[in-house]
C-alpha cells in the first residue's frame, strides 16, 4: 500500500466557476436564536446539503446526500438531533447559490457541500463568516482561500496531483506517461498542473500532454492516437468517471494497450450505466476510501442495508463531513440556539482543533481549512479496489 501524508501547497489554482459572474444575490444566512435556526426543542441542529442530485454529476451528489443522512443518524444523540435538508445544484455555481438561499430560509446552521468544485467556489466566494461550510469533495484552493469558516474534507488539487506523481515515481518509474485532462474544468486542470510540477521534480518521463474541454465528449480517439504514437505506456488522467469510461472504450477499440491512472473523481467508474467493467481491470486511482477495505465494513453494510448499493468515496466524504460537524459542536460546547455568527465562529475554531477517525482516514484541518490525511493508491482487480 502506498500512503502519503498530506503536505499542502499554497499554490493558487484559479477556479473557472468562481468567475461565473453570478447575478444572484446571496441572502444573509444568520441562524439560530430568534432568526429561525435551531428548532424550538433546543436540541435540533439544522444542516444543509448542497450537491448535484440530477444531471451528469448526480452520482456524486446523490452519494454524498446518502452518506450525510447515515451520519446524521449515527451522530445524533439524546441531546443533539442532526436535522438534514438537501438542495440540488446540478453542479452549477449559480444554482448552488440559489440552493444556499433556500436553505438559509429553512434555518440552516451549517452546510455540507457544495459537492463539486465550481459550485463550492461560487458559494464560498459569497458566503459571510456566519456559516460553517464543510465540503465533502471540492478540491480547489480557492474554496477555502481567505475564508475563516470554510473547510474541505477532500484533498486539495495540489495534494492529489503531487501524491499521484510520487506514487508513479515509486511504482512506475520507467513508465512513459501521457497527461490527459479537461482544460475547462477547475478540478482536472488543477490536479494536472500539480502532477506535472511534481513529475518534473521526480524525473518522470511525460511524453505527451492532451486536453479536452467537455466531460460529455463521446470520443477521445484523436488524443489517444497521439499518446500512442508518442509511446505512452501509462495515461494519467485526473478526470471524472464518465469521460474515463469513454477513454477506456476508445482505447480498446483502437487496440491501445496502456495503463490508466486517475484520481478521486474517477471513483464511480464501475457504476457507469452500460460500461463494460472488464475494461477497468488494472486501472489505478488515488482515493481515500475503499468499500473493500475491512475497516469500512460496518459503514458499507449500513449503507447497503439502507440503499441497496455499495458506497463510493463521495458517500464516505459526506459522512465524514457530518462526523466533523458533530465533533466540532461537542468540542465547542456551543448553545445551538445562539446567534448564527457566534455558532459559526466557535465551530470554525473547534474544527481546527479536532481530530477524527473518519472513513477516509484520520482527519485534521490546518489554518486554511484544508484537510490533512493520507492519500492511498488502489488498483481495480475483479471489480474491487485493492491497495496498490
Language-model segments: residues:
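Bacterial lipoprotein signal-peptidase II cleavage site
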Residues: 27-39
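Beta-alpha junction/loop-to-helix N-cap segments that form part of ligand/metal-binding clefts
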Residues: 38, 60-66, 74-144, 153, ...
Amino acid at each position: 500500500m502506498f500512503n502519503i501524508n498530506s503536505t499542502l501547497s499554497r499554490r493558487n489554482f484559479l477556479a473557472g466557476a468562481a468567475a461565473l459572474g453570478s447575478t444572484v444575490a446571496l441572502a444573509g444566512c444568520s441562524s439560530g436564536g430568534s432568526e429561525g435556526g435551531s428548532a424550538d426543542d433546543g436540541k435540533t441542529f439544522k444542516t444543509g446539503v448542497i450537491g448535484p442530485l440530477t444531471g451528469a454529476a448526480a452520482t456524486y451528489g446523490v452519494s454524498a446526500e446518502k452518506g450525510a443522512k447515515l451520519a446524521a443518524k449515527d451522530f445524533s444523540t439524546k441531546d443533539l438531533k442532526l436535522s438534514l435538508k438537501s438542495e440540488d445544484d446540478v453542479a452549477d455555481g449559480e444554482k448552488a447559490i440559489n440552493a444556499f438561499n433556500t436553505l438559509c430560509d429553512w434555518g440552516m446552521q451549517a452546510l455540507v457541500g457544495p459537492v463539486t468544485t465550481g459550485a463550492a467556489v461560487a458559494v464560498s466566494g459569497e458566503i459571510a463568516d456566519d456559516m460553517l461550510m464543510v465540503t465533502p469533495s471540492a478540491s480547489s484552493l480557492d474554496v477555502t482561500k481567505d475564508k475563516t469558516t470554510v473547510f474541505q474534507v477532500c484533498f486539495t488539487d495540489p495534494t492529489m496531483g503531487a501524491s499521484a506523481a510520487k506514487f508513479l515515481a515509486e511504482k512506475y518509474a520507467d513508465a512513459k506517461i501521457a497527461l490527459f485532462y479537461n482544460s475547462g474544468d477547475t478540478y482536472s486542470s488543477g490536479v494536472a498542473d500539480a502532477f506535472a510540477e511534481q513529475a518534473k521534480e521526480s524525473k518522470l518521463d511525460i511524453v505527451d500532454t492532451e486536453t479536452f474541454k467537455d466531460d460529455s465528449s463521446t470520443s477521445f480517439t484523436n488524443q489517444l492516437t497521439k499518446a500512442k504514437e508518442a509511446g505512452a505506456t501509462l495515461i494519467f488522467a485526473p478526470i471524472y468517471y464518465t469521460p474515463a469510461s469513454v477513454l477506456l472504450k476508445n482505447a480498446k477499440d483502437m487496440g491501445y494497450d496502456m495503463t490508466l491512472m486517475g484520481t478521486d473523481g474517477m471513483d464511480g467508474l464501475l457504476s457507469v450505466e452500460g460500461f463494460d467493467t472488464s475494461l477497468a481491470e488494472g486501472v489505478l486511482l488515488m482515493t481515500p476510501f475503499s468499500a473493500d477495505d475491512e475497516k469500512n465494513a460496518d459503514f458499507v453494510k449500513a449503507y447497503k442495508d439502507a440503499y441497496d448499493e455499495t458506497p463510493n468515496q463521495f458517500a464516505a466524504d459526506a459522512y465524514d463531513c457530518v462526523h466533523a460537524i458533530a465533533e466540532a459542536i461537542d468540542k465547542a460546547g456551543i448553545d445551538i440556539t445562539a446567534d448564527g455568527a457566534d455558532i459559526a465562529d466557535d465551530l470554525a475554531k473547534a474544527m481546527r482543533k479536532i481530530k477524527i477517525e473518519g472513513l477516509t482516514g484520520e482527519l485534521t484541518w490546518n489554518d486554511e481549512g484544508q484537510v490533512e490525511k493520507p492519500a492511498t493508491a488502489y488498483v481495480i482487480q475483479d471489480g474491487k479496489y485493492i491497495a496498490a
